[in-house]
Amino acid sequence: MIRRWSLILLALMLFCSAAMAEGELRGYSEGDGYIYVTFGRYFQSIDGGTPDNGKQAWQWSTQAKTERKAAKKAKKEYDPGEARKDPILWRVMSADGEKVFLLSEYVLFASVMHSSIKEFRDYGSDFTITDLSRKLNGEFMADAFSEAEQAAMLERDGLGKVFLPDSRELEDPAMGFSKQKSQNKLRKAWATEYAIRVTGAYVYQPKNGNHTPYWLREQSTTDKRQGRSIKSTGAIGRLGVTGEDVGARPAIDLRPDAIRIEGGSGTKDDPYRLVPVSEETGQPEVTTEELE
């Protein structure tokens, strides 16, 4: 009997070990690509639209322009409809024993980098002084993450818990990017329905891919009045910091010991669902999904 239970216990241990291996978070792999996860929830859809790599982006953009024009003519306030919160989809850029670095798959909203060109020119080398950094670590974080989820997030080198990627990261082959001009397209990102119809994110024409320009967390090295951004080809360029239609593609770091995988297979269509766990009990905490 003892031997039988020992064999059963061994089998269970092997099963759990295999399950953990299958659910292991890792960074980009040249052969296997990215691991995808969901964590937190944010306004993304209105009429149930999904980004679909820009298939609907141009339609949302033209629809919003038409509706805004009609509202202005009728002297009414533009009303795109009620936005719905959906799980935020992230790429796992890198993962080790200290942190899991996540980059939003989509542009989640549009915003100025900073409202004062003079202030940005003088202090823009410090991303934390910008209006956008304050929005990411204030309004956005409060809307997107529960207290338990925020507790699982790490502060990145004085940037706060929510930040933007920089050019070094978006040129790093270890994270799936490249410095080669022919690979600029890898940096393209598409905006959500909410980002386009509600916050006014710009959409490049269909011939260019229907994607959206988005900010990096850096000041331009050639014109300090401007911020670095991703342009129509996916190249790293610069734009005036008061541009209201440039997108934000948030990034976060998570504590590996403060999260757990609950479902999914890690693909873009079936991402792992990450949930925060209690330090005391090791059990899942309340998430934004449960608070909805």
What are these regions (language model features)?
Residues M1-L7:
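Bacterial N-terminal signal peptides that target proteins for export
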Residues R3, C16-E24:
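Bacterial Sec-dependent signal peptides at the C-terminal "C-region" and cleavage site
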Residues E22-E292:
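Collagenous Gly-X-Y triple-helix signature in extracellular proteins
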Residues I8-S17:
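Bacterial N-terminal signal peptides
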